[in-house]
Design a protein with these regions (language model features):
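Bacterial Sec-dependent N-terminal signal peptides
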Residues: 1-24
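Charged, glycine-enriched surface loops/patches
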Residues: 118-142, 159, 163-174
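Sec-exported extracytoplasmic/periplasmic mature domains
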Residues: 88, 92, 104, 128-135, ...
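Conserved SGNH/GDSL esterase-like catalytic core that processes O-acyl groups on lipids
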Residues: 23-122, 148, 153-158
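Alpha/beta-hydrolase-fold catalytic nucleophile elbow
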Residues: 102, 142-143
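Catalytic His-Asp segment of secreted/periplasmic serine-dependent ester chemistry enzymes
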Residues: 14, 146-219
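Short secondary-structure boundary/capping segments
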Residues: 39-40, 61-63, 131, 166-168, ...
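Conserved beta-strand termini and adjacent loop/short-helix elements that scaffold enzyme active sites
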Residues: 73, 142, 177-179
Length: 219
């Protein structure tokens, strides 16, 4: 009996230890941000970019906006769920004058297939947290792009964009930046030439278009 209890206890310790040792999704990305901030104090009154890979892969974003000070803390593959989970880590170290968000596309395309209302709910939660941290900062949301590889999700993306647009338009010191039409051909179809082979991430030409649309909104 004693041996059984001993073995059971050791098994419990092993399982518990294994579970607690597992890292949360994107843990390493957050630690990387902390390392960057420790090496160099983040500037005050900058523009804080948060979100998923469309921002993450914009590594030379400062070259597109040379007269702006931008802190890019986006991490590829992230969902609004992850922004909410890591909100303290993403917001506490900074004192921005503006927060620009691109996120939600991965929520919609996730295997759990959340509804437009659920994705919108996640955004509102993050917006509320950002506003609580930065009462006077401008908050801007860049609309979800209609990536060719995710055409099956376009209807939900359009619903989410509409909901967030109406929400942001009703808020003070908030912006909805719609990049969707600027990425279309004259006939209204998506310009696939703006995308890499994966038809998900953009080429530099896509970012040039984003720059033209976004610039008037940046503080």
């Amino acid at each position: 009996m004693k041996n059984f209890l001993k073995i059971s206890f050791l098994f419990f310790v092993f399982i518990f230890g294994s579970l607690t040792a597992q890292k949360a999704d994107f843990y390493d990305d957050i630690q990387h941000f902390k390392k960057l901030d420790a090496e160099k104090t983040p500037p005050k009154d900058a523009i804080l970019f948060l979100g998923s890979s469309s921002f993450t892969m914009w590594k030379d974003v400062a070259d597109y906006f040379p007269d702006k000070t931008i802190i890019n803390r986006a991490f590829g593959g992230s969902r609004l769920l992850n922004l909410n989970y890591y909100s303290e880590d993403l917001l506490n170290p900074y004192q921005p004058k503006q927060v620009v968000i691109y996120c939600g596309e991965n929520d919609i395309a996730h295997a759990e297939k959340p509804s437009a209302n659920e994705v919108f709910k996640r955004f509102k939660q993050f917006y509320k947290t950002v506003r609580a941290h930065y009462p006077n900062a401008n908050i801007a949301y860049v609309s979800i792009k209609y990536s060719p590889s995710r055409e099956q999700y376009w209807p939900t993306m359009k619903q989410v964009n509409k909901k967030i647009k109406n929400f942001m338009n009703a808020k003070k010191n908030a912006e909805f930046i719609d990049i969707t039409e600027s990425m279309n051909n004259e006939n209204g179809s998506i310009r696939k030439d703006l995308y890499l082979e994966d038809m998900l991430h953009m080429k530099p030409e896509g970012y040039k278009i984003w720059t033209k649309v976004m610039y008037p909104y940046l503080k």
